[in-house]
Amino acid sequence: THGKTTTTAMLTWILEANGLQPGFLIGGVPMNFGISARLGTLATGENRFAAGPPQGKTAPSGGSEPHAVESVGAFVIEADEYDTAFFDKRSKFVHYRPRTAVLNNLEFDHADIFDDLAAIERQFHHLIRTVPPSGRVVSNGLEESLDRVLHQGLWSELRTFGAAVSDFTAVGEPHAFDVLNQGRPAGRVEWALSGVHNQLNALAAIAAAEHVGVAPADAARALASFENVRRRMEVRGTVAHAGGAITVYDDFAHHPTAIRTTLDGLQRRLGSPRGRILAVFEPRSNTMKLGTMKSQLPWSLEAADLAFCHSGGLDWDATEALAPMGARAQVGKNIDELVTQVVSAAQPGDHIVCMSNGGFGGVHERLLKALAA
């Protein structure tokens, strides 16, 4: 549900830094590459259809090299459970037939097509059934929902991460930590990212890379030069003030859990004392527009000193949903009103985090311009 783009980008960079030149398709732009997709290096070698050729295909035969095929050495794809098309309501990821599948976390989302969490868990079960016996499933040991999925059936090697009893664990702070593989030191990550969520993303990527042949120590070392993904706490600009610069960030968070994780990560990175955190968010996804998770918004915004919600296009009352936050929350019916509210409240040293899964009406640039005026 969360961390798909970042974890996919981490894994892709690990493979790239270790000479594999992978192909990839990512739902964001990894800063290390500057593009969201490429084919990767083609390699000719022995027939790689170890689990049998894809449906509708037959393994090549005939000629002087009857088992030679041309294939991508490694291809990393970001996959999710959203439906394939209006005429195919199966989740997109059941079509991919992965050799290595990373299950990072799972909670209810996409209320426009799923009735409940159990319906999503069934789709994840279908995904696991497509992984061959020679494949690997990498799963977050902290997620009860994923445990339920695994108990429905597992026919491949399993590697877990995150929990104290998992195969891959971390010791240390999210920005600098040791990686343990079954309790033994396996590498160290020191990087510019923050947040426990990114620490978990790193463990998932390291466990997946190991299945492709990259040693955990080499994978951890590669993450030191990982530059994150655009729109993941991306600094869009700063405005200088005598009392401290105001920083404006852009983040893709739109689910309550993602909002909370993003703000908690920033709070942890800033430490204490720190400038205030101002959360500016747009409930734009289909799930949020339906109001399915509106009651979770005050919880998701606990780390914010002030919160500003864009209520345009909503069928529910954002003011009522945010009432438990009292004076800490304001609601703007349009972008102009929202910008005015944020600028009026902003102080030197503030950190303004803009969160939406869309363009948010160019609010980042408009805030920077208004703050500098």
Task: Annotate each predicted stretch with a short phrase.
Residues 1-139, 145-156, 203:
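Phosphate-binding loop of NTP-binding sites
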Residues 22, 185-189:
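Short beta-strand segments
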Residues 76-78, 189, 247-253:
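Active-site-proximal beta-strand elements of phosphoester/diester hydrolases
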Residues 141-145, 163-164, 312-315:
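Short, polar loop motifs at secondary-structure junctions
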Residues 178-180:
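A general beta-strand register signal
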